[in-house]
Every structure is written in C-alpha cells, then in structure tokens.
Amino acid sequence: MSQHLPLVAAQPGIWMAEKLSELPSAWSVAHYVELTGEVDAPLLARAVVAGLAQADTLRMRFTEDNGEVWQWVDDALIFELPEIIDLRTNIDPHGTAQALMQADLQQDLRVDSGKPLVFHQLIQVADNRWYWYQRYHHLLVDGFSFPAITRQIANIYCALLRGEQTPASPFTPFADVVEEYQQYRESEAWQRDAAFWAEQRRQLPPPASLSPAPLAGRSASADILRLKLEFTDGEFRQLATQLSGVQRTDLALALAAFWLGRLCNRMDYAAGFIFMRRLGSAALTATGPVLNVLPLGIHIAAQETLPELATRLAAQLKKMRRHQRYDAEQIVRDSGRAAGDEPLFGPVLNIKVFDYQLDIPGVQAQTHTLATGPVNDLELALFPDEHGDLSIEILANKQHYDEPTLIQHAERLKMLIAQFAADPALLCGDVDIMLPGEYAQLAQINATQVEIPETTLSALVAEQAAKTPDAPALADARYQFSYREMREQVVALANLLREHGVKPGDSVAVALPRSVFLTLALHAIVEAGAAWLPLDTGYPDDRLKMMLEDARPSLLITTDDQLPRFADVPDLTNLCYNAPLTPQGSAPLQLSQPHHTAYIIFTSGSTGRPKGVMVGQTAIVNRLLWMQNHYPLTGEDVVAQKTPCSFDVSVWEFFWPFIAGAKLVMAEPEAHRDPLAMQQFFAEYGVTTTHFVPSMLAAFVASLTPQTARQNCATLKQVFCSGEALPADLCREWQQLTGAPLHNLYGPTEAAVDVSWYPAFGEELAQVRGSSVPIGYPVWNTGLRILDAMMHPVPPGVAGDLYLTGIQLAQGYLGRPDLTASRFIADPFVPGERMYRTGDVARWLDNGAVEYLGRSDDQLKIRGQRIELGEIDRVMQALPDVEQAVTHACVINQAAATGGDARQLVGYLVSQSGLPLDTSALQAQLRETLPPHMAPVVLLQLPQLPLSANGKLDRKALPLPELKAQTPGRAPKAGSETIIAAAFASLLGCDVQDADADFFALGGHSLLAMKLAAQLSRQFARQVTPGQVMVASTVAKLATIIDGEEDSSRRMGFETILPLREGNGPTLFCFHPASGFAWQFSVLSRYLDPLWSIIGIQSPRPHGPMQTATNLDEVCEAHLATLLEQQPHGPYYLLGYSLGGTLAQGIAARLRARGEQVAFLGLLDTWPPETQNWQEKEANGLDPEVLAEINREREAFLAAQQGSTSTELFTTIEGNYADAVRLLTTAHSVPFDGKATLFVAERTLQEGMSPERAWSPWIAELDIYRQDCAHVDIISPGAFEKIGPIIRATLNR
C-alpha cells in the first residue's frame, strides 16, 4: 500500500460538503466529447486506460480513521477498457445516448457508494460520430485537470495511431502537491496570506444574489440550469477594439460584475472568483482538485466608466493572485465562523482561458459539459475567444432560478454591451437596464387616475346618514345608535368642542377606551374642522407627554380615571366624555375642508422620540372611496372596530362603514388581544368585515378548530390584513378553516393607511410562490415605484427600494420640516410632485404585483433554529447595569469548525457603571427569559462595542471568547471519567474539571459527537456510539454507560424504550415511524415545558415487534404492553409520525376500550392504512419515496465509524421499512372516540385526499394543521418551528 496522505487544498471542503449533503451525485463532474470523423474505438479505449493510469489521483482511495480522513494511491488498481456502445440502429441515437449518460449521473456516486469514481464510455451515434463520455469524482480532479487528462488521452491515441510508444505521463505525483501544501502551512507565506485575507475579510461587503431567496452558507444543488450566451454579433469585439488598452479578460469581468451589481441593485457586494492555484507550484501539472474560490469585493461607482472599473478590478485580482494559495474555508474559520455560516460571497466568476481543444487528425472534437459539481447560487464562466468574441456559460441553482428569468437577465447583458459599445465613455450610473416595453408596463400598472369629489370625511358621513337615517349605525355592549341618533350625538359634541375653544385647523387629543364614545369623539372632531390625535392609554406617561408637547392640541378628550395622568402637561384644556349628550337640534357644522389635516398619528423615531405624521382629508377620502368601490359594503354589513386607535388601520374602521350604510360594532377594550373573546364577538354581532395584523391572525387561527370556525366565523365575508408581511401558509390555513376571503393591504403611516392591495385567497393565493403574499397593486391615484441606488427604475424581478407617490401621501411630520424634506422628496419623474421613500425592499412580479422582500434584519438559523438576534439584544439590554448589548453567532473553538454548523451564540455587554458585570448571574436571568436555543452560551463584557469607519457596529471585529475552565463541581473520578473529561477538553478546547459537565452545553454538537464517539471507542477498546453520547452527554453519565455491561451499553439508544427527556410532570409517548427508531422526536425538547418527560417507543432488531409480528394489531398490542409498564393509568399523551401515527391511533382506541383517558393524540402526516394501496407497494418492492425516507433515516443516525455499526444500523432501518410495508398490507383501523390533532404535509398530499374524509370513520373529532413541507420533512427542526409551539399550546391546555 502506498503512502497515506491527508486531504489538502479543495479536498477537505468537498469531503465534508458531501458528508453533510443528501445529494447522491452532486460531487461528480462529467462531460462528453463529440467526435466527428473516423475513430478507431478499440484503440481509443486502450488510450483511455493508458491515460487514466498516468494520473495517480484517479487511483486514489479514501479512508476515515478516528475522525480523520486519509487518501492513498491504489497501485494495484487496473482500469477496465471502456464499454463501446453502438446506437446507430436506434430510433433516436442522440436521445438514447443522453439518457445513458444521465442515468449514470443519477446513481449514488458518493465516495463511499462502492461505485467507480472514474468512468468512461464510447457511444457511437452515427457512422462517423461518437460521444466519448467521461465522469470523475470531484475529489480526484478539478476544472483544470479534467480537460488536461482528456488531452493526454487524445495524445496517447494519436501516438498509437502512428504506431508510436505511449507518451510519458506529464502529471506530477499528487504526493508532491501534498508535501508542498504542508510546507506552505508552516511557512511565512502562510502567515502573510493569513494577514492579507484577514484584512480583506474586514473590508468585504456583504454577498448578493440575483434571486430574492436568501443566500445560505450551504445550500448547494446539483439540480442546475445551464444557459450558454454567445456574443458573436461584434458588439463585444467592437467595445474591446475601442478600449485597446484594456485586456479582453478584464473587460469581460467588468461587464459581468457590473451586470450582476445592477441586477442585484448592489453597488458594493462580494462575489467569488476562481483561482487556478497552480502557477509556480507542483500543482501546475498535477491532476488533483486545487482550484480555489476566493472572495472578491466588487465596488461600482456611478461616476466611473467601464474601462475604469475593469482596470480597478484587474489591479485587485493582481494583488489577490499573490495570496491565492490560502484556502477559502480557512478565511471563514479565521473569522470565527464555520463553512456552513452565511456565505462569504454570492455569484462565482470564472475566466476560462485554458485550452479545451483536442488535436486528433481527421476528427473534430467538441466538448459538452454535463456536470461540474454543485452550485450554491450562480456561477458565470467567461470565455473570451481568439476572435475577439465573448461567450458566457451561466450555471444556476434551480432552487433559486428559473429559465425564463435567466433568459431575461441575459437579454439585459446584451443590452449593456450594446450601450457601452455605442459609447465606451458612458458612466456606470447612466446605463439603462430596462428592456423595451418595460417602461410602458410599469406606467400601465401605475395608471390609477380616478376623479374623486372634492369633499371631506364629515360630508361623506352626513350624506349617507341622510339616506339611511333609521338604519343601525353604531353599537357596543351598552349603547346602540341609528344613523340619525349618531349624527345628533356628533353634532352635539362638535358644538361642545367649539365651546371649549376648538377651531378649524386645530388638533384634539383623544384618550378614551374603546367604546361608542371613542367613535363619536373622532367624528365630532372632524365635524368641528379639527384633526384628531389618538393617545393609547397603554403607553407610558412620559411617551404620552412627549406626544402632547409636540402636538400642542387645543383640547384633550378623556375620562375621569385617566385625567390625573395628564395633570403635569402645561396649558392643556380637557373634556371628560363618557356618556351620551342631549341633542340640541343644531344644524350640522361640517367645518372641515379638503386641505385640512384629518388626523395625526405618532410613530417611533430613530432618535428615540416619536414623530407625528399628519394625514390630510383628501388623502383619507381617496382611500375610503377606493375601498368602498373595491370591497363594497351594504346596509347588511357589520364591521368590527377592534384595532387600537393609535394604529392607522383603525381609521377605515371608524369611517368606512358610515359612508356605505353599514353598522360598526365596538369590541370591548383589550378584547383584540384575546382570540377566544374575538370569536364570541364575531358570533354575537354577526360581524361580516374585520381586520387582523398577521401575527394576531396566526394566534386567532391557532385558537380555531373546524367546529368553532363554523360556529363563530360563519358570517365573515371579507377579512383584511396589514401591518406585517402576510405568510402564505397562514392564508391557506385560514382559507381551509373558514373559507372567508382574505385580502392583503400594505401601506406606511405616511400614506393614508394603505396604498396597495392583493387577494390572499382563491386562485391568487394558489399562485403565490414566495413565503408571503405580495403587497400587490396600487390603489386609486397612487403610484408605486421601485428604484435602485441611482434612482433608476428596476425591471421586474429585481429588488429595489420602494417609493410611493400620489394623493394619499401624508402632509409631513408635525413640527419637523427637516425630516419631512428628507423623506418626502421631489419626484424625479413627475415635476412638482412628491415621493416618499418607505425603507422597504420590494420587486415587481411578472403579473405586475409588488412583492415585499423585507428590510435589513438580524435573523439567522443555527442548526435548524430560526433566531432573531435583535430580540436577544433587547432582553440583554434590559439586564441590570447593561448600557449596550449585542448578540453574535460565531464558532467559539476551531475544533468545532471542522464541519457542520458549529456556531454558538455569544452575548457582548457594555456596563453602564463601568464596573465588572456578574456574567454568571446575568446568564441565569437570560435563561429564565429566553428559550434554550436563544440563550447565549457565553457573555463577554467589553469596554465598548467596536464600530466601523461609518459608525456602525462592526460585527467582524467582535472578539472571540476564550474558553476557560468552569468552576468545578465534583471532580471527575480517576479512570473512565478522567479519560472522558480529557476527550471533552481536547475536542471542545476548554478545561473540563466537572463530572457533571455536559458535552453539548460546552459547545458540542452532533458532528462533534461522532468524533467523540470515535475517540472514546479507540481509548476504551470497545464501541461507543454517537447515540450514547446523545442520551448520556455528561462526563459521569457517559462513564456509567461505558463502564456498564457491554451489550446493554452498546445498545443504548437502540432499545424499545428511548428516554429523550426526564421531567417531573406528565409524559409524552412518541411512536416510531417505519424506520423503527424514535430519535427524531428529540426536537420536542426545544418546545415542551421542562416539566414534561418525553419517551420514544421503538422497534429495534432483532426481535422487535415489527420483525416478529404477523400483523399490525400485534405491533399495537406489544407497544400497548410497553406503554402500560411505563404508565399503568391515564391520562395518556401520544404522538406518532407516519406509521407511528397509525400505531398511536390504534393504541389510543385500545386505551379507550380499557376505560382510560387519552388526553392528547397527535398525528404527524399519518393516514389510515385503508387509504393506501400497500399490496401494490409490497409487490413492487420499496418505491423511490420509501427509499428516500430510508436514506434520510440513515443520514440522520449515521455512526461515526465506517463499517459494521453504520451497516448494521442501515440494515435495521431497511428491514423495518420492509416489515412496515408487509404489515400495512393487511392493516385495518380501529375507531377512536376521542379528539386527535393532525399535521398534514401539504407538498406530498395526494391529489383529492381530504384529511376530514379519510379519518372521519376512525376518529370522532379532528383538528387539522397544514404545513408547507413534504412528508419526510415534517419531523425536521425546520418544520417543528411551527409544529412545536402548537403541540406545546395543545398540551398546556
């Protein structure tokens, strides 16, 4: 056996990426060479064998030993002659050849699959036409060496044709590359490169993407779109000729970088650039993968020209080439992150200048790429040719892009080249990226001009009251008024306001609880010609005082009990109002004018002081008239007033019903926070129209069951949402429960409530592809503009800043002309008009609607858990003596950065007093407030937070915490505990002196658990599994298992009972799916209250119930006996996934037959056996979906060691799946007379399958929660972000 070598250069990243991926062949590279001419196929086959033998990396074998990976050249390996296939008589030779090659690429070709890592075929498709198919694993070759091997084989073939000897190998042994690489790691050059890239990393702008989907650190896909662009019309050649002082490669790069920047709407972004990493190195003539993708900061200035950008980028690359040997993964690790963190860069750029041509006499050769490895986002390969033309190959991740979008992007690139060719001195900021017709398309969307009457709110209401004087108008729990009676009250109160000195143009503050008197007060203020200023009495006194000081209202309307809160506000006249007035028979005042301010609403300000937004009468009149036209109310409608009056959505609730003859009913104060109270309110008053903010709609939906939805929501005809992004899944759940049409509205406080609309039900909802419903189309007399950083309109599909124009814009900020001027700017497209910048990011969709993409935030995911860093920051800032606080996710020790997501949350605190903080006590407080996955594992006190040059927080400069020895409890005992503590310390980078130290609490994670198990297996000369580490994660517990009886310890985690968590309260029993294992249910511990115990019930092999039973009833009976041993009497709480749900339902029925109480039955995408054709599945063997589940199980529980353990585990899983299919062929359901909670995986739901119909014969009552995921993902941490809280809430009830 030859020398064992470590993985170097690109190999470690490829190895780890494949290990962490479920993709079967993503790391294979393949192409075929189309040979046209006379080919001696047997001779070429001999040349292939000879050529492959000359490249030692093609004979590499790989082995994993104690968590380390080694490679060695298998000198005994002899390549077989490639198969020669003749398809000339086939009906479609080309299509058949393509199918053969794709079939090879669809296999499991992972490095440990047992399949050949090198494969060639010679396929004849015509008399003088051959396809020479070549496929390699990426661990063996890269994009430089792949064609080099092909050329050498062609050279050998030509020599054999001439009767000459086989040419000598031109390839350097890869051992030389490894040795050189290891020497580099110990050299001063390494130190210089590390310093260079540390500085580059600090200056690097964020990555960008052409896709609206967020960039993930590790989301590569082998499902790739390929688009080849040929710029052979002479325009690139013309441009290059005019710019003769610029290299064509530099010009091509600048064009691509500029094009990407404009389509991303980012003038500063990070791209990846592929470096050969070969010049001046042994790797120059080696065949292993050494290409390096390094981050390139792209900075585009509006006032520079394309040649200036090209020259600057060329200078950057020249400097980077001196440091190109430094691994990209090491740059990430140096910054305290793991390779799966947020990516360093987005699109990858590659200039391909190496030769793909083959010189074979009498034969033309053309290479066709089939697979180049996975793509994270987008890759651009630039091919400037010797004729002066340019071709570009685009590779795009299909999860993020579709072909029509890419083709449209390509058209914009052609247009850019044409513009620069016509004027090489054109400034980057003056380039137009809109295609012909797109300006007209946007103009059509914004053609919203509708003539409205010159009127006011009070005039509109008075007009309607005259039409329907005796119709019911306004009611709460104590009072009811007709339209006539309401107008009498309004006029009486308006006269009273006049008596208190209120004049037209004044403002009047209102601090009233929700009741009819609040509505009457607002109408009376408008009647008197003033503007209302709503005060939320739930606000702190200081905030209310600030608002009153800024607004200086002429009067405050409030109640006796609230009056003392305003006693120290100077010069404030007040009126207490809480009872009907005696009508005086006075004539209407109607003193408002269209130019008057209608209302003032305060919003939070960046300075910490709220700012008042003034909205005019004409603006809100336009909004209400549009709404009545678009969603007409009648005298039969009942509108709910439940929105707090300080939220501008309340405006249409207070006035819209009264311009349409409808009735407004007032919810009780604070009722809007109580979903059950709102259900009763809707049912009692027969509400037809209401509003929810999406978060409250989610809470309301969670409170509904199909029965209560029918009972309490039957009268709802139209429901509106605004205030937050509206999740599409929530809309689907609402539609399923109630059927009431849902409408999404959007608008900032600065623009009369709402400026756009979109249906969130029916066909429009079905067509939504994003996670949230679009904000839609503009309302009457309103324009939506999406502009880039240079104030140019962006084309459809491109993200930009959202601006608003038109009649509904607010008048400005109260007393803040400077702020008004900065936010309400001149419209550059319509002279004399204003435009408001919302601060929201959006894009146009193909249907002309606007999609909201969000604002900048601090959201991230760590090992499947979504985390808002800002939420943690706010909790930390509330801690005693903390002046500033920020949370950061980073890798605390480099041992954890070897693969997977090794990040931990670190809290950085600045003391207000300057004295040392008791971080241990503060950490304990955080644990009481935050869920475990959001509590920082370390708190670090800093004298001040690091700031960047522009004064913003510099997260990259936050120091990594040093792991120090924790305060010891009981010291580890000599022997096993000491060995285990030392293993913890070596892997986690900290001193472990406590026998109760927990591996995961110290920063360990599942991937490190594999390494720990391998290390302990070696030290104790017996098998220790990752499962044992997971269920016994402290030093003492793990020592007890290892020192115990060998077979039982070996099987820890593989027994019938799997204790997932111990608590002092009730137990949730979780039944295994078809795999036989219940380990997946460990995710529940993140969501259930600590008092709950969680126990998994499994079917191990051999002798498990699934293997020994003849039918499913016997499995149920066996598990029932196990359950009764654990808990003889109820109440019982049962949960099952897939087959486990079938078992849980059958056991629940048997428990009820015994007279026991089943308090909870949860089913995760479970269906009665009667709904599936299991006989057909058994006859046909395991289908692809079942095999996909087997692989998912295998990946989830794969042991650290190669060999018997993982093989045994996989055999167990596969055997249990086969038994499951066998048992289900004869299974029948047993009726359960209780209630069940069913979670449905929508993406894999069979067409026409109704959960209600499927389960109605077998379950008495069913609550259904639909999830946007596939069957195999419903148990995943991501899916449980929604499922976990629902289960928690249901169990707590």
UniProtKB/Swiss-Prot annotation:
Name the segments for region: Elongation/condensation: 1-301
Question: What does the entry's cofactor note say about binding and number?
Answer: Binds 1 phosphopantetheine covalently.
Q: What happens to this protein after translation, modification-wise?
A: 4'-phosphopantetheine is transferred from CoA to a specific serine of apo-EntF by EntD. Holo-EntF so formed is then acylated with seryl-AMP.
Highest taxon above the source species: Bacteria
Region Adenylation, residue ranges: 482-887
Associated pathway: Siderophore biosynthesis; enterobactin biosynthesis
> Which cofactors is this protein said to need?
pantetheine 4'-phosphate
**Listed name of the protein:** Enterobactin synthase component F
Q: Species name for this entry?
A: Escherichia coli O157:H7
